[in-house]
Regions:
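Aromatic- and carboxylate-lined catalytic core of secreted/periplasmic carbohydrate-active enzymes
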Residues: 43-47, 61, 71, 383, ...
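Exposed aromatic-hydrophobic patches
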Residues: 96-100, 519-521, 552-559
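Non-catalytic, glycine-rich low-complexity segments
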Residues: 43-79, 85, 124-129, 491, ...
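Bacterial N-terminal signal peptides
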Residues: 25-37
Length: 571
C-alpha cells in the first residue's frame, strides 16, 4: 500500500526515467546522424580543380550579417600546408564555404567565428583525379603567357560581356539570352569573358539589385545567387570568367560605383566577399574598371591617394583568395595602361590595357614587367552608341580595322579581349537589343577565329617579338585617321610588318600594305628553314609557297597585293 505522496514520487520517477530515456535515445540518434553526415562528407569525392560547397547556419541574431559577422575556415591541404578562406553570407542565417581543390588527397577544414553556431564546425572531403584543368595563371618559364593550373598552355582569347550577369527587359537581356550568347561564343573558340559584377548602368537581375543600399552595405544575396548560376554555366562551357567587382565613377551618376561605399573598410569588406564567393570558380579578378575615374568624382583627392586605396583593396581581395587567382586592374582610355600597379603584390598581369592607339608599341612597352599583357579594350565592332547610324569607336568601323588591330597586338606577344556593339554592354550603347545572332557580326567572328586557330597550331608561347629581323624598303606607317560621314576615327597603320620568332625553329611574319619585297633574317647561328606557308587572315586559307628547298640565313618574298598576309617559316 502506497501513500499519496509516494504514488506521486513513483509516477514522477517513472516520467523522469522515460524522459531521460527519450533524451538519451535522441542524443544517440543525433550522434549517429552527425557521424553519418561527417562520414558522407569524408567520403565525398571532389574532382581536382572541381567545386566543393558546404553550408552552415549561424545561431546569433545580427542586424546586418554581411557587415556584422565574419567567419573563416582554416583549410588543411593534403600536403600539410594550411590556408585560410572566408565564408560568405548567403541570406538569412546561411553561411557558405567554397573550395576548388588543386591537390589530390584528403582536405580538412575548421571554421572560426564569433558566432557559436559557426565556430568549431569541421568537415573534410577527398580530392580525386579529373580531366579538369583549373583556372589560369602565368606560365612557369614564360612569364608573359598563360597556363591552366594543371600546366597546359592557355591561349587567352577573350570577348567582352560587361552585362553578363544582369537583366534588362528593354534589351531582351536575361538568363536565357545569356546562355545562348555563351553557347555561341564557346562555339567560336572564346575561352575568356570579362564582366562587371556591379553594372555601371545600374541594372539588376532576376534576383533584384545587388545592394538595397551601398551606403548602408545592405547586400541582396538573391542577386549574387543569380550570378552563381550564370558563372557556373560559363565555366561549364570552358570559359574563364574575368570578374570586375566594381567600376570607377567617371560620370558621377553610376549607381554602383566604388565611391558609393561609405569608406575604405566597406570597400575592402566587399572585395573580401567577392574573393570568398567566387574564388573557387575558374576566374580571375580585375580590382576596378577604369580606376582613374574615382579621381574625377571624389572631392579633394589626389591620383596617388586613389592609387594607394586601390592597392589596399587589391590586397584585401588577394589575401582573402586562398585559390590565388590572377588579379589585375583596368584603366581609362586616356591612360591606356596600368603598369603603375606592377609593384603591388597582387598584380598578376604585365598590363591590362584599355588602349586604342599604337597597339603594337604599347604591348612592347609593357614587356619589361612580368606577367601576361592583355589589351582588354581596343575595339567594339560596329558600335554606335548614339544611334545615329554611324560607328563611333576607334578601330571598330570595319572587320578590316578590327583584324589589323588584333594582329598588331598578338604580333607583339600580347593577348586580346575583343567586343561587338550588339553584345559588349548587354545591348546598351548600341541600337539594341542584346543580340549575339546579328548577321553583321559574322565576318568579324570568323576572322577573329582564324587568328586563334593559327596561333593554337604553334607553340605560340615560345615566340618572341623580333621586329628588327624583318625589313622592307619603306618604314612602317603610323595610326591613320579614317574619315566617316560625320566623324573621324583612329585606325591601325596602313603599312606595317612584324615578326615573332623561336629562333632557328619558327618565324611568323605579319605584313600589310606592302608593294615590294620583304626580307626576314633568321638570326645568329640559325640553320635555315625548309617549310614556308602562307595564311590569308581574312579567309583562313593556307598554302605552301616554297619549293621544298632549304632557305638559309634569310627569306625574301613579295606579297601578291597590299592586303594583310601571314607567313609561317619553319624547319
Amino acid at each position: 500500500m502506497y501513500y499519496e505522496g509516494e504514488i506521486d514520487m513513483i509516477i514522477n520517477e517513472h516520467l523522469n526515467h522515460s524522459a531521460k530515456y527519450r533524451v538519451s535515445t535522441l542524443a544517440t540518434i543525433i550522434t549517429c546522424l552527425t557521424a553519418f553526415s561527417a562520414s558522407l562528407m569524408a567520403n565525398q569525392a571532389v574532382d581536382r580543380f572541381g567545386f566543393f560547397e558546404t553550408s552552415f547556419k549561424a545561431t546569433g541574431r545580427y542586424v546586418n550579417p554581411y557587415k556584422d559577422l565574419q567567419a573563416s575556415a582554416v583549410i588543411r591541404r593534403p600536403d600539410g600546408t594550411r590556408r585560410t578562406l572566408g565564408l560568405f553570407w548567403d541570406g538569412a542565417d546561411v553561411w557558405k564555404l567554397r573550395i576548388s581543390p588543386d591537390l589530390l588527397g584528403e582536405w580538412r577544414f575548421n571554421v572560426r567565428s564569433a558566432d557559436e553556431g559557426l565556430n568549431g564546425q569541421t568537415g573534410q572531403f577527398t580530392c580525386v583525379p579529373s580531366r579538369r584543368k583549373g583556372s589560369i595563371q602565368p606560365m612557369p618559364g614564360y612569364a608573359h603567357h598563360f597556363a591552366y593550373q594543371d600546366g597546359t598552355p592557355f591561349l587567352f582569347w577573350g570577348d567582352t560581356a560587361w552585362a553578363l550577369y544582369q537583366d534588362e527587359v528593354s534589351e531582351k537581356l536575361n538568363r536565357e539570352a545569356v546562355y545562348h550568347y555563351i553557347d555561341e561564343r564557346a562555339g567560336q573558340g572564346i575561352n575568356v569573358m570579362h564582366s562587371m559584377l556591379l553594372q555601371e548602368a545600374g541594372w539588376g537581375n532576376r534576383g533584384g539589385d545587388p545592394f538595397d543600399s551601398m551606403a548602408r552595405e545592405t547586400l541582396n544575396p538573391a542577386y549574387w545567387q543569380e550570378i552563381d548560376v550564370r558563372l557556373r554555366y560559363l565555366n561549364d562551357k570552358g570559359i574563364i570568367g574575368g570578374l570586375v567587382p566594381a567600376w570607377g565613377d567617371k560620370r558621377k551618376t553610376e549607381p554602383f560605383a566604388w565611391r558609393l561605399f561609405p569608406g575604405l573598410e566597406a570597400r575592402k569588406r566587399y572585395a573580401r566577399y567577392i574573393a570568398s564567393r567566387y574564388g573557387a570558380y575558374d576566374v580571375y579578378f580585375i580590382v576596378s574598371g577604369e580606376w582613374h575615374a574615382e579621381i574625377r568624382t571624389r572631392p579633394n583627392v589626389t591620383e596617388q591617394a586613389i592609387r594607394a586605396e586601390f592597392i589596399e583593396i587589391g590586397n584585401a581581395l588577394h589575401e582573402s583568395d586562398a585559390h590565388n587567382r590572377m588579379v589585375g586592374i583596368h584603366p581609362m582610355t586616356q591612360q591606356g595602361s596600368v603598369r603603375e600597379f606592377n609593384r603591388a603584390k597582387w598584380m598578376s598581369f604585365g598590363d591590362y590595357q584599355q588602349n586604342y592607339r599604337s597597339l603594337h608599341a604599347r604591348i612592347l612597352e609593357s614587356r619589361p614587367y612580368p606577367g601576361p599583357i592583355v589589351n582588354s579594350e581596343y575595339g567594339y565592332f560596329l558600335r554606335d552608341s548614339d544611334f545615329d547610324g554611324e560607328v563611333d569607336k576607334n578601330n571598330s568601323f570595319s572587320a578590316e580595322a578590327m583584324r589589323h588591330a588584333t594582329w598588331d597586338i598578338v604580333m607583339a606577344g600580347g593577348y586580346t579581349v575583343t567586343g561587338y556593339g550588339t553584345t559588349y554592354m548587354g545591348g546598351n550603347r548600341d541600337k539594341g537589343p542584346f543580340n549575339v545572332d546579328d548577321p553583321r557580326n559574322d565576318i568579324w567572328e570568323r576572322q577573329y577565329r582564324v587568328a586563334q586557330s593559327f596561333l593554337s597550331g604553334l607553340d605560340w608561347w615560345k615566340l618572341q617579338p623580333h621586329d628588327d629581323w624583318i625589313s622592307y624598303a619603306t618604314p612602317r606607317s603610323s595610326d591613320r585617321n579614317v574619315r566617316l560621314a560625320s566623324r573621324t576615327l583612329l585606325g591601325p597603320p596602313k603599312t606595317t610588318y612584324w615578326l615573332l620568332a623561336e629562333p632557328g625553329k619558327h618565324y611568323v611574319a605579319y605584313l600589310r600594305g606592302l608593294k615590294g619585297k620583304v626580307t626576314i633574317d633568321f638570326g645568329p647561328g640559325a640553320a635555315g628553314v625548309d617549310k614556308v606557308r602562307l595564311l590569308n587572315p581574312r579567309t583562313g586559307e593556307t598554302r605552301s609557297i616554297n619549293q621544298g628547298t632549304i632557305v638559309r640565313d634569310r627569306f625574301e618574298w613579295s606579297a601578291p597585293d597590299t592586303e594583310d598576309w601571314v607567313l609561317h617559316l619553319s624547319n
